[in-house]
Amino acid sequence: MGAILGKKIGMTRLYNDKREAISCTIIQAGPCFVTQVKHAEKDGYDAYQIGIGERDEKKVNKPMLGHYKKAGVTPGYKIAEFSKSEINLELEAGAPLDLSVFKEGEKINVLGVSKGKGFAGVVKRHNFGGGSRTHGQSDRLRAPGSVGGSSDPSRTFRGTRMAGRMGGCNITVKNLEIIRIMPESNLLVVKGAIPGPKNSYVKIVSTKK
């Protein structure tokens, strides 16, 4: 069991022993450090707060700067919380966290925010088929059709699929295989795609199975 915070670098392809091309994602997982240790007696739950990267102090507001200095670490770019059962180590504030908690071939879950696509219609957002392309119709090709009932129920049901903001949601991709670990450069190569654009931050957690 292990967990760490990482930044998505991009995608590439690697070849396995069978000379098959495998799509992979490169993640920069570190340098990470513990910024706070939360205890059930004081905070109501047990967790580790993890930071990643080193940021110029001039670009950090005073409350966050004080938070980092209390832990005795340099300001980072991102902070995220992990439960103690996910990290499965005894750590103190200021302690470093690296890729030694993982091994090649291990399965992980990656949590991130998907790419935001803005306001989208029902054809793009929910894969609707649209209206008929015949009988002189001109403006019903990508329309949703009827969304309500008649006099009974006289309303549109909550949760009806309609146009709206698409993307920008919390996504978890499960059971991705670690292809390669490069501890000297804090790089992690995983099989397949992970959520979010380049340079977005993700949480990496070992699968519980």
From Swiss-Prot:
Q: Would the keyword RNA-binding turn up in this protein's UniProt record?
A: yes
Gene for this chain? rplC
Q: Does the keyword Cytoplasm apply?
A: no
Q: How does it assemble?
A: Part of the 50S ribosomal subunit. Forms a cluster with proteins L14 and L19.
Q: Can you supply one Gene Ontology CC term for this chain's record?
A: cytosolic large ribosomal subunit
The text of the family note is: Belongs to the universal ribosomal protein uL3 family.
Extract one GO molecular function annotation from the record. Answer: structural constituent of ribosome
Q: What is this protein called?
A: Large ribosomal subunit protein uL3
List this protein's GO terms for biological process: translation
Pfam families with a match to the protein in the record: Ribosomal_L3
Q: What role does this protein play? A: One of the primary rRNA binding proteins, it binds directly near the 3'-end of the 23S rRNA, where it nucleates assembly of the 50S subunit.
The UniProt entry, under PROSITE patterns, shows: RIBOSOMAL_L3
The UniProt keywords, alphabetically, are:
Ribonucleoprotein, Ribosomal protein, RNA-binding, rRNA-binding
What segment(s) does the record annotate as region Disordered? 128-163
